[in-house]
Amino acid sequence: METFLFTSESVNEGHPDKLCDQISDAVLDACLTQDPDSKVACETCTKTNMVMVFGEITTKADVDYEQIVRKTCREIGFISDDVGLDADHCKVLVNIEQQSPDIAQGVHGHFTKRPEEIGAGDQGHMFGYATDETPELMPLTHVLATKLGAKLTEVRKNGTCPWLRPDGKTQVTIEYRNEGGAMVPERVHTVLISTQHDETVTNDQIAADLKEHVIKPVIPEKYLDENTIFHLNPSGRFVIGGPHGDAGLTGRKIIIDTYGGWGAHGGGAFSGKDPTKVDRSGAYIVRQAAKSIVAAGLARRCLVQVSYAIGVRGALSIFVDSYGTGSIPDKEILEIIKEHFDFRPGMITINLDLKRGGNGRFQKTAAYGHFGRDDPDFTWETVKPLKWEKAQA
């Protein structure tokens, strides 16, 4: 039986790039909560003792950007210089301007266009992917790497492993079998965890705690065997972390945000962008389309691409690839998708309820992945019934 290895990585919420994603989306949440029509393009960068938010925001909301930055950093666990950043004493720089009037008139006509008339906020192409290898219809490598990162944060915050600090990275390699284009996981080949820690803990204690409290609860026993390789803090020391260890920037973890290297990616980041930015809303609708196709049994794997032009209200192109796993031809799957999903940016916003802020909705997406999450705020994860196709299949 021929097999192959595939690897996905993740970083947890204390990684400096992910810190920036969460701040950018916390700003978006604050704007949308007060003004659902806010136009937001918020970037964040960070380095030792400094966080800067910058970009273009047009909103009626009264937003205290500095307070949002400090609160987000504090909630993640950056409460002293020792752990990489002191939320209450770091410098916070703000350079926010309004959206370009040229973009505003082309996209939403300075708020005069009806939803079905709203154009895309930029050009670009986005991909959605789904696979039947997990209940989430997501790649197992990505699911496990992401859950390991989330578990690291959980055992840090609940005191199970008090030596943990906020920054951390995970990576999982799985041995797969290709079953007619579908991906079948056979075993976990390698688990890699590099986590920030305090000065008191030994490498032996780190390895023992990670195996017992992080790996064991996350990775199903059936995938582990005597040949599984574990690299647990292989560099030997990871005390300096967070923005003290590395600079951070919004939008640098786009593969972690999506499918862990599976499928494809158009290159656009998500965080800090309101739904007129098709980098985000377009990627959400094609995930829903791909997931709905796999959930309906029309394919075991599915990739959907959509493309846009700035100011143009409809999609330029839609593409489908079932990797040979379709129960009907790809051209028929494409027609089903066109029949059931509205790719106009204004209608995506309405159908997925993307103007709704509150409940830390978009900040939640900014750590541990935008897809495969069981949360009612992740409206794009709702499988859409494909009634017409069931009569045809």
UniProtKB/Swiss-Prot annotation:
Pathway: Amino-acid biosynthesis; S-adenosyl-L-methionine biosynthesis; S-adenosyl-L-methionine from L-methionine: step 1/1. It is found in: Cytoplasm. CDD domains: S-AdoMet_synt. Pfam families: S-AdoMet_synt_C (PF02773), S-AdoMet_synt_M (PF02772), S-AdoMet_synt_N (PF00438). Its main location: cytoplasm. K(+) binds at residue 43. InterPro entries: ADOMET_SYNTHASE_CS, S-AdoMet_synt_C, S-AdoMet_synt_central, S-AdoMet_synt_N, S-AdoMet_synthetase, S-AdoMet_synthetase_sfam. Roots and shoots. Binds 2 divalent ions per subunit. The metal ions interact primarily with the substrate. Can utilize magnesium, manganese or cobalt (in vitro). Binds 1 potassium ion per subunit. The potassium ion interacts primarily with the substrate. GO terms for cellular component: cytoplasm. It catalyses: L-methionine + ATP + H2O = S-adenosyl-L-methionine + phosphate + diphosphate. Its cofactor is Mn(2+); Mg(2+); Co(2+); K(+). Its EC number is 2.5.1.6. One of its GO terms (biological process) is one-carbon metabolic process. ATP binds at residues 15, 167-169, 235-238, 246, 252-253, 269, 273, 277. Mg(2+) binds at residue 9. L-methionine binds at residues 56, 99, 246, 277. One of its GO terms (molecular function) is methionine adenosyltransferase activity. It is an enzyme of class 2 (transferase). Keywords: ATP-binding, Cobalt, Cytoplasm, Magnesium, Metal-binding, Nucleotide-binding, One-carbon metabolism, Potassium, Transferase. Catalyzes the formation of S-adenosylmethionine from methionine and ATP. The reaction comprises two steps that are both catalyzed by the same enzyme: formation of S-adenosylmethionine (AdoMet) and triphosphate, and subsequent hydrolysis of the triphosphate. Belongs to the AdoMet synthase family. Homotetramer. PANTHER family: S-ADENOSYLMETHIONINE SYNTHETASE (PTHR11964). This is S-adenosylmethionine synthase 2. The gene is SAMS2.
